[in-house]
Structures are given as structure tokens and as C-alpha cells.
Amino acid sequence: MSTLVVMASVFALAGGGALLLRRRLEEILPLSVVLIVGVQYAFGLFGWLSAGFYAVLALCALSLALLAVRLLRGGLGDLRRFLLTPGAAVMLAAFVWALLSFRAHMLYEPDEFSHWGTVLRNMMHFDAIPAGVKEANITYTDYPPATTLFAYFWTRLSGGFNEGDPQRAMNIMILAFLLPAMRAQRWKRWGSALCMACALFVLPTLFNSGAY
């Protein structure tokens, strides 16, 4: 269920931004992830990480309202041009894949125990960026917190720590930053769009054999 809620939040944020900036959804998705991370980080610097989480939810609600208003004014033309794109379909497929693939996932890699899983649990426990908490049990305090902040948003929406959520968040975040490559794809050239989509899923494995 958390995956569906995160998907709705990310798509609402990206959809509102796409119609506001008159850009295709796949071009705005990376900005949506950056906004989710950036807002939480800004609040987290002052020790208000929960407030940052709720601020992001407020932005999602505001973006959803903007999306509805813009669609009422622009009609189905804007919907087809900016939102119902091949890139949006790829992102939707990625969320479905993340939902199904990590249902029984458990942390087992050494770096998951030494950092990725541990830092998220500390972030949830202290409700703060762990690098600034003396009592936090983390090894690498100098790691940038962006990935963990996106996983924190995901985990907060799920209502509790789930070992599959950090992997879901990380992989969705990676794909979101690759997705602008889909901006030139069109439904009438579905073969080209399919090849590009497959390439985007394969690309992370070229640099990390443990991807996915």
C-alpha cells in the first residue's frame, strides 16, 4: 500500500509541475524527487524532520489541486500532451515492479547493514538527520543524506520500517533521474519508446552489479 501512496504523491507533485511549467511529466519527475528530498533536508537542518515530511505532503496536495484546475482549463489536450506520455507509463511500470519485487526483501548486503538500512532506522527513531545526532548508531556520517531522505519519506508513508522500502525508494529514485531520456518518445513510435525503456532499466546494472 505504501508504494501506491508514494506513487500517488510523486505523480501529483510531478503532474502539477508539468502543467505549471508546460513540460512533459518525465522531465519534471527528477525535480519532484529533488523537492521531496530538499524540503525535508531544509527542515531537518533545524531538527524538524517530521515538519519537513508534512510540508512535502502539503506540497503534494497543493500540486494536486493545481493539477485539477489546470486540467479543467486546458482540457484533455494538456492531459495527453504533458501527462499521458510513454515516460509516465515507464514510471508507472517501475512502481508496480517495485511493489511486487521487494515484498519479501530483507537487508543482507554488508553495506545495507553498515549504512543504508541502519541510517534509515536511526532517522526514523530519532526523527532527525542521524549525522547530527550523537546517540545515532551510524558508521558513515559523511554520506550525503539524499537517498535516505527519499527512503524516509517512503517509510513514513508506510507507517513503519519495512526492509523492502529502502530498496524500493533507491531504485525509483535512480529511474526518476534517468527518465528525462524518454522526453522525445511518442506513442506512435512505440518500438523506439520500448527500446528506450528497456535501456533505462538495464543502465544501472552496468555500473552496479547489485542493482535491483
Residue positions per predicted region:
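Specific aromatic-rich, kink-prone transmembrane helix
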Residues: V10, A14-G16, A197-F201, T205
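Hydrophobic alpha-helical transmembrane segments
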Residues: L4, P30, A89, A193-L194
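Internal/C-terminal transmembrane anchor helices
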Residues: F82-F102
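Membrane-interface catalytic loops of GT-C/OST-like multi-pass glycosylation enzymes that act
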Residues: L45-A55, L107-P110, F207-Y212
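Low-complexity, intrinsically disordered, cysteine-poor segments enriched in small/polar
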Residues: L71-T85, L149, R156
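Active-site lumenal/periplasmic loops and adjacent helix-entry segments of GT-C-fold
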Residues: L99-S192, M196, N208-G210
